[in-house]
Amino acid sequence: MLFDYNFKRYNFRILIYVILLSGIGVMAIWSATNQDRSMIAKQIFGIILGLILAICLSLVDYTRLLSLHVLIYGACVVFLAAVLLMGRTAGGATRWLILPVIGAIQPAEFVKIGLILFFSWYFQRYQEKINQPITLAVGAALFALPAFMILEQPNLSTTLVTTVIIASVVFCSGVSYKWILGVLAVLFPLGAVFVYMLQYEMIPFLRGYQATRILAWINPKEYSAAYWQQENSIM
């Protein structure tokens, strides 16, 4: 059974912390939206739904959940494909699916969790062969498909975040430092070439605003207008 939990061991303290933090978030929205009741109601509904889902998932034995690795990976690909084929477009990006009752959801956010589970299984399954080129190549190919589909939405930020997450999974899986140092040795010069090409809009898979945001992060003074959003998010 997936659900086989001793409630005496349940960490209710974490649940209380989540509720308190969510309450602070609701108050912040109440203040920022000039007490817009519709926004507050939507936020509270999302919190309740999220809490129910989080509690259910916390009761699942993750080791048994990993036995569904093929289904999990398949669901990630199917949902991302559904976004590209029939997703809702807003602001030039197609990132959302409209579901009955629930409303708009962004599958890429759930895909992060799915890929963590899948690649946790993958590198556990092939632990003894983890440093073989074929093992890493297959893992890279399996990651490339959903990553490309997220990038096509377009959603560069989520693609980068997901890449860092899966890279962390690979690092924690016990891959040899020779591979890590080798990859870094290749990435550093490639990064310099990337920045150079970025300045002259020579990166075909990046939209104009995406390139500008990256350049603003590297050189905020020269791209002060584009850096405004990043600067205010830090404040």
Predicted regions and their residues:
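Membrane-helix boundary/helix-loop-helix interface segments in multi-pass membrane proteins
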Residues: 1-23, 27-154
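Hydrophobic alpha-helical segments of polytopic membrane proteins
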Residues: 48-50, 70-77, 133-149, 156-201, ...
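Hydrophobic, glycine- and aromatic-enriched re-entrant/interface helices and adjoining loop segments
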Residues: 90, 94-96, 183-235
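Flexible, glycine/proline-enriched loop segments at strand-loop-helix junctions
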Residues: 126, 169-171, 220-223
